Amino acid sequence: LGVLVAFILSAMTLKSVALDGARFNETLYTWMVVGGLKMEVGFLIDSLTAMMMVVVTFVSLMVHIYTIGYMEEDEGYNRFFAYISLFTFSMLMLVMSNNLLQLFFGWEAVGLVSYLLIGFWFNKPTAIFANMKAFLVNRVGDFGFILGIGLIAAYTGTLNYGEIFAKAGDLGALSFPGTSWMLVTVICICLFIGATVSYTHLRAHETGRNL
């Protein structure tokens, strides 16, 4: 029921954004400030965010409906629904964040729940082996992601999307220290490594064959 409500609200949000031009970008809470770098909790809802909210909640709703019958006699029925609900929350936090720190926390939460789901049947040695491999592969991706976020924070002094995009022109004029590479290229490569290693072919290859 909760996921159905979330899907309906997401669809209403998409309608407001797409047809009425509504937009939301606010920082709700400042967690801490370290050396002038603000670590905040905030949300950005634009057309891309609204579309992804609908996709996430719709897919989650379909999974919930299918799971009601598929997992009915499994002793881990309630635990599975807890994992899927946490996965949905993590994905929504990821796509709705207005800063890189919150996005990273959502990203890590998605990785954690993926680890738990891969090893859901923990009495099977193959499942445990597969989720450990997924955990290790994810750490490689996280390293690239953290490097990219760290470079952005170091050269822009902010983690907020709006402020970063406002300084994108300045980043484009800089080179990575000790090389002739453009700084923005290095940052994009780091973020790309984080995304591809964690959630595409490498991960599927390393975990899928063990289940």
What are these regions (language model features)?
Residues 1-209:
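...captures the hydrophobic TM-helix bundle architecture rather than a specific catalytic motif
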